Amino acid sequence: MTQANLSETLFKPRFKHTETSTLVRRFNRGSQPPMQSALDGKNVPHWYRMINRLMWIWRGIDPREILDVQARIVMSDAERTDDDLYDTVIGYRGGNWIYEWAKQAMDWQQKACQEQDAMRSGRYWLHASTLYNIAAYPHLKGDELAEQAQALANRAYEEAAQRLPGSLREMEFAVPGGSPVTAFLHMPKGDGPFPTVLMCGGLDAMQTDYYTLYERYFAPRGIAMLTLDMPSVGFSSKWKLTQDSSLLHQHVLKALPNVPWVDHTRVAAFGFRFGANVAVRLAYLEAPRLKAVACLGPVVHALLSDPQRQSTVPEMYLDVLASRLGMHDASDEALRVELNRYSLKVQGLLGRRCPTPMLSGFWKNDPFSPEEESRLITTSSSDGKLIEIPFNPVYRNFDRALQEITDWINHRLC
């Protein structure tokens, strides 16, 4: 089936799909104060979703393109679930968040199909994949339209990988007690086996969101990147997120000696946001298999255990947490009790001495991850490094932090 036909088949005009903001039915919804963070964007008035401009631009989307799509959503007079929230248009039609971003992606997909130059075509496919991922954001369980957009994102990513430098392998790993999981191994030019970074992404992102990290930071240093979707989303959607948050990544890590392109004696883990919960768990549970663990804006204790901090987090992010935990009808109180069990300090890990070198980067006044969170990680390690990242200029400082983190990882993998 051609890519265009797949798009037409998946996205037949229908208006009965459940609108994204209604998928999680928590009882204690209320107004939230304005909030901004480098990794998550900000909760803009009249939007259900957090607008994550930094990460979208970092992934290659033009700021004007973001504004154009937002404008189409704002201008729609179609029926909304909540008249006060622009991105709650019901059904797959003009003004609906998924419709508008997927439409934008299809334009780039068409350009990719028409482009004769393989490299340029690959760039267009990658651009389309990123836009499809934004269409599916924040990837709530049971969001049929988002799942269809995600299928197109994965297909576009595979098309891009065939045309861009280096090579990509789609790999399946068995996990006892359930379905196998699919991972993508990104390899730089040259002969393997390669030192490899196991990427542990945030709960509101997909494994195909991190190509920029590989291309700009890891590949130039000859490092491969292995990505895996977090439990309950994407290729790992059949697995529920549990207190054993590192379960899937742990099984992949244990299987690496059987992967000929990976130097299993030189592996590090890198965790964004809740992905740091996975990475730090691995630092404790699989220390002999890891040379280093790096974290950025980690969510390992404070947000999971502090009700006051949870009350400042945007509704969308609480919905993401509830969705990943399978608590679609939970009160805030029930959600808080469950989240507390995911704290690595409550689990008795963080605070104990860990032999794995650990680095953690933080932004001051980050509502998701206070400085103490990163300090707790680095002081628990026998070889810890703490990095404070200035907020402004946000893009340049983000790039500098990633360069420093990559150099640190590279030093420990050599």
From Swiss-Prot:
Keywords: Hydrolase, Serine esterase
Reactions listed under catalytic activity: a carboxylic ester + H2O = an alcohol + a carboxylate + H(+)
Gene3D superfamilies given in the database record: alpha/beta hydrolase
Enzyme class: hydrolase
Its EC number(s): 3.1.1.1
Keyword Hydrolase: yes
InterPro entries: AB_hydrolase_fold, FrsA, FrsA-like, FrsA_esterase
GO molecular function: carboxylesterase activity
Family the entry assigns: Belongs to the FrsA family.
Job description of the protein: Catalyzes the hydrolysis of esters.
PANTHER family per the UniProt record, alphabetical: DIENELACTONE HYDROLASE DOMAIN-CONTAINING PROTEIN-RELATED (PTHR22946), ESTERASE FRSA (PTHR22946:SF4)
Protein name, UniProt field: Esterase FrsA
Species of the source: Salmonella dublin (strain CT_02021853)
Source taxonomy: Bacteria, Pseudomonadati, Pseudomonadota, Gammaproteobacteria, Enterobacterales
